[in-house]
């Protein structure tokens, strides 16, 4: 538990509230029973009984439940007896000066004799306070710790007068501060999301499609939703920064239908089948140990009487909210509501509930705030109530079947008391039009005052289709979503075409989109004096300093720069050695003529020299020196091109007058000097610095001006939590060029033993197993909070230049961007893979289009290709995406306004982009990217205009690296006329229309630029 943080300010503030109430003469006498001390014992964690006064006190004061802990409250001191590890967390509470009471921490070890002395010390403290001890008698505790305490306390228990102090604590817990209200509000948001976004959709599906499911199974299905993190991270839920690790159910959801209803909070879901008449559902979540509750009634084909009763219930609840305000007496509220029923609907009085709810907070049901006619308590601003209003055992005069004879109506909401109208935290839809479902084609059953339902829109819960006649609502939604996506893609394609024509309009850009290589001048020596002294020997010299080869030609030394040398070869023939030097010149067979510019290609060039010598060892050494120098020159040129975009950042402006914001014990990728050691990150004025522990000058500086993206990825489903920086321009880290720098910490399975500071691994199966598992979850949550908070500080320090981005795991899909199958996760601005190296960061607003390849029936995977707006950038391929995720990928691309096309085959994008770059204006004038969406031959399109200008190959992707000679021979064979396969097709008896179609396709292919020669002709 070493990762927990105890808020000492909150602790002492709330402890002061408790002591003030306790010392108050009236409260001390009536609520605390004049007790002189309060004894609170908590044993092992009990999931079956989470709502107890003792654990509520722990949560309220400390922020957490501390199992195996004893607290003794006195009016001048609080004593806490707990394990060593927990005690270390609480030590700072005792160091606070000017607190309302002293804090005394006692550390319990595994020494039984020492623990016995500590228990006896607690008893001595109690004896010194007049022996009247306040306890919480309804709490049930168990475990080894409780057994040890009872063995000491039970023999002397008769000495003390034990009184019930529950009401005193309840008053202190009743009024919530801002932090507590925020927790209840967060829990309520989740409850509303599950009710309106999950339960309603599932309920409508079951009823609409006539599927059978029991109440208990439906309830279990909802309860398991808490493990579905993707659902809670859906943007449409608008849950904000809810920490899912702090979320839990208050109780198993209660679902009732089919004539059997129980409106009590203690109701249990039965095993009867779900029935489409009147369905009641109530559920509640706890967030950071604070509860919420919401309940709704859903009506299926209701008659006019049911609608009338429900409308009255909604109006009654509205009045109930009006009565609940600061200063109102709880008993009077119930009496007023009952008076309204007697005045307007006396027939419903026997069916009205006996109480209208209770207080809610750390405890799900604060019984001291029970809303009934007998409670004299006065409501105060800051209190929170769980209001439950309803009518039970109602008789349906026109039942459709035996299960519809009786029904009930129920509304439950969580509210905050204010000085005016209360704040309703659970604003799930409850109007008549939102909860009524009609299967009939006409609306004759509607009462006059209720308007017919509008056609359902996306996200509504209404079932308006006729059962057995039309398709289900889900199918309709899918079809409408597909139509909307297709229409949106057409708009995006038109926009891309217009942007391309405008971007490459005549005169706005050079006619060629390819940057032409420039002529490089090499000068070996500026003057004769720089030549080596050995030139007088008229031998072949290799001058490393000048990067030149000096050749004796007609008795004169002639230098040739190494860059002019193409290759060298050595042959032994008899007693002589032949050294041949081939030089670069235009027009060479197999040469890359376009990449080798010359000042005057029509000038005369020396292509080769051949030297003969009888000195074998000398020529061998010369040949080796030439080879080595050529390799070194080639390596330098490669490195120059590779590091051409590497920049040298400005200097980091450090914060000198104080310790900058920092985070410790983080690793960096790429590692400095190849050594994996934890360091720390500091935030300075114009950037951040990662400092290695090796030496002071071993660090990485990242300036805000060079940061392009900042990501935080939580450790959910991962082994690390990380902060990732994607740079605008690469930098050098050690000897490596990098554009991505990542800081991370591993989520290990190591914890500290509570009896010391030695690390030990989990020992699953011992008595602390549940506590340790909970410890691991909380450790992960703590890591997420720590890293996210630091990432937010980085974004804040950048003064708006960068924004923090977090991956959406619910939108993730698997794919292979490099060699490994990884999980790619969209963010607001990017598509990323940050867990494994090499990293993937694709900026969405730099994408021109996307192309889905190998999309055809029978294949299990498809590929995704991104083409960038900068056509000189090579496209990025993400291969082997499961076909099950095709619709999700399409929906994501469409939601990001990315125009995409799909096709059945892989395209040769190297050839395509080369053609596009050669003349981008002509490309867009001839239709641009529209060729990707043109129908293929097997779809039966006979129009010449629709023929794709690029022909896809069904060959293996590895075939894209074929020799040029093979491509030329294939071109020639196709230009000569029909291929052999076509001749065979003709002989097999094709009709004239088929032959004419092929001829038109062949002409169109040769008139336009093509992808690459295909070994087979596709039909």
Curated annotation (Swiss-Prot):
The taxonomic lineage of its organism, from the top, reads:
Eukaryota, Fungi, Dikarya, Ascomycota, Taphrinomycotina
Q: What start-end ranges are recorded for coiled-coil regions in this protein?
A: 767-799
Task: Specify residue ranges for compositional bias: Basic and acidic residues.
Answer: 470-490, 995-1013
Question: Which Gene3D superfamilies does the record cross-reference, listed alphabetically?
Answer: 2.30.29.150, Creatinase/methionine aminopeptidase superfamily, Creatinase/prolidase N-terminal domain, FACT complex subunit Spt16p/Cdc68p, Pleckstrin-homology domain (PH domain)/Phosphotyrosine-binding domain (PTB)
Acidic residues composition bias: residue spans = 936-994
Function text: Component of the FACT complex, a general chromatin factor that acts to reorganize nucleosomes. The FACT complex is involved in multiple processes that require DNA as a template such as mRNA elongation, DNA replication and DNA repair. During transcription elongation the FACT complex acts as a histone chaperone that both destabilizes and restores nucleosomal structure.
Location of this chain's protein in the cell = Nucleus; Chromosome
**Residues found modified as Phosphoserine:** 444-445
This protein's major location comes to: nucleus
Give the superkingdom in one word: Eukaryota
Listed name of the protein: FACT complex subunit spt16
GO MF annotations, alphabetized? H2A-H2B histone complex chaperone activity; histone chaperone activity; nucleosome binding
